[in-house]
Regions:
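A cross-kingdom feature that marks ATP-driven nucleic-acid transaction machinery
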Residues: 229-419
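Phosphate-binding site recognition
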Residues: 1-258, 262, 407-419
Length: 419
């Protein structure tokens, strides 16, 4: 390193940047400013100072400048927006997302069910994963890290929201309403006693901050304008916190953690994890497609639902391959018994009775997928082997891949070897 930089105190930012640019000028250097928003909070003029430094000193030097920040709204405002002094000077931007389940599972080396249940709590946020050791008792770790008043994640959503928005209580109420099962715009507004027009800006902000996501059926040609959109909590830990911590804050403040542990025992696997498993299955299918283990090129992977006079129709995983004119419909079962052919027959019936699907994808071949934690009955295995349109995935193994979905790269190894 530069010993002078270790000894000298600079009173002027430009002098510091000039020294960095002039240090071994023939060599490429990377200058990283971490937590840029907090620097701006302490010195509101810093974006203008940095603009001047870039234009006058760094732009034509051998320096790559990287600005990092965990506050999305402030990075947008002070580094990316049209009003920022730095506007127009970036060469690229990276918005880091949580790690996908498939990437984590491939390196963690723990049983599939443990990985799914841990991911349902932590998502793919590396900092959260530091507190959850693979293979350790998950409920004990939840108790220590999340339910304890001294736990690192006990107040995490409070810290995240208060750093990003004003009137955090209003946003908390919206997230709580969604956590309670209100997913349609009208139902969320009704639960809060708000007009939908007043609610929409709050929802947009929460989506921009990755707290929420708006999902639409894969049949929608213009998802942004769709009136069938449903709102969900996008972050696994935030969803967990609002389900198992926020409603019991009073009890937890009195060190009564047992009430939450009882709730976890009652429905964590059957309801909470089973819901997360649907997103994991979408990730698994996307990974199989990317690795070309499955000959399917999806333009979109999501879900499908329809409420009409014939009742409610829901399909957990749905993907469309416009190139080959094929549709994938999948059902996800996270329970302790093998999936029987009855599940396949019900899925097939859902697809066949949907006039909307036939209209949206005329002439498309339908491929069916069943994702199971606990395998399949012999009747289901026999059914798949005689068909060219059924994909079976048990935990981390592709048990059956129909010939129509195979290519030269198609194999039947554990999924962790496919990703």
């Amino acid at each position: 390193g530069n010993s002078m930089l270790q000894r000298v105190t600079f009173t002027d930012w430009l002098d510091l940047f000039r020294e960095i640019a002039n240090y071994r000028p023939e060599e490429k250097k990377v200058l990283v400013i971490d937590e840029f928003p907090y620097l701006v909070k302490t010195n509101a003029a810093f974006p203008s100072i940095l603009q001047n430094a870039w234009d006058e000193i760094l732009k034509d030097s051998n320096v790559m400048l990287i600005l990092c920040g965990s506050l999305i709204s402030m990075m947008q405002k002070h580094a990316l927006s049209h009003d920022s002094p730095l506007y127009g000077r970036r060469s690229a931007q990276i918005r880091l997302k949580p790690l996908p389940f498939t990437d984590l599972y491939a390196v963690q080396g723990q049983p599939f069910s443990h990985a799914v249940e841990q991911y349902s709590v932590t998502g793919g946020v590396p900092k959260y994963l530091e507190f959850f050791e693979p293979g350790e008792d998950l409920y004990r770790q939840i108790q220590e890290v999340v339910l304890s008043k001294n736990g690192f994640l006990y107040e995490e959503p409070n810290f995240l929201l208060k750093d990003e928005v004003q009137s955090a209580n209003s946003y908390f109420s919206i997230i709580r309403a969604i956590a309670d099962g209100n997913h349609k715009l009208g139902k969320i507004a009704g639960a809060l006693g708000m007009e939908t027009s007043s609610l929409t800006p709050y929802l947009s902000t929460l989506i921009d901050l990755d707290f929420l996501k708006k999902a639409t059926p894969v049949t929608e040609k213009n998802p942004e304008k769709s009136r069938k959109g449903l709102y969900f909590i996008s972050d696994n830990f935030i969803r967990f916190w609002f389900r198992y911590v926020y409603p019991y804050k009073g009890e937890l403040e009195l060190d009564n953690q047992q009430i939450v542990l009882d709730e976890l025992e009652k429905d964590f696997i059957q309801k909470f994890v089973a819901f997360s498993y649907e997103d994991i299955c979408k990730d698994i299918f996307a990974s199989l497609c990317r690795s070309k283990a499955v000959d399917f090129a999806p333009s979109r992977i999501g879900s499908y639902w329809l409420n009409d006079i014939n009742g409610d129709t829901e399909i957990d995983v749905m993907a469309v391959d416009h190139q080959k004119k094929q549709v994938f419909a999948g059902e996800c079962k996270y329970h302790n018994k093998p999936v029987d052919a009855t599940v396949y027959y019900e899925l097939e019936e859902k697809v066949k009775k949907s006039a909307e699907l036939r209209t949206a994808f005329p002439g498309y071949k339908v491929l069916y997928g069943l994702f199971s934690k606990s395998g399949f009955t012999q009747r289901m295995l026999d059914q798949a082997e005689g068909r060219d349109d059924i994909l079976l995935i048990q935990e981390d193994c592709v048990l059956w891949l129909p010939p129509s979905m195979r290519n030269s790269a198609s194999t039947f190894p554990p999924l962790s070897e496919c990703f």
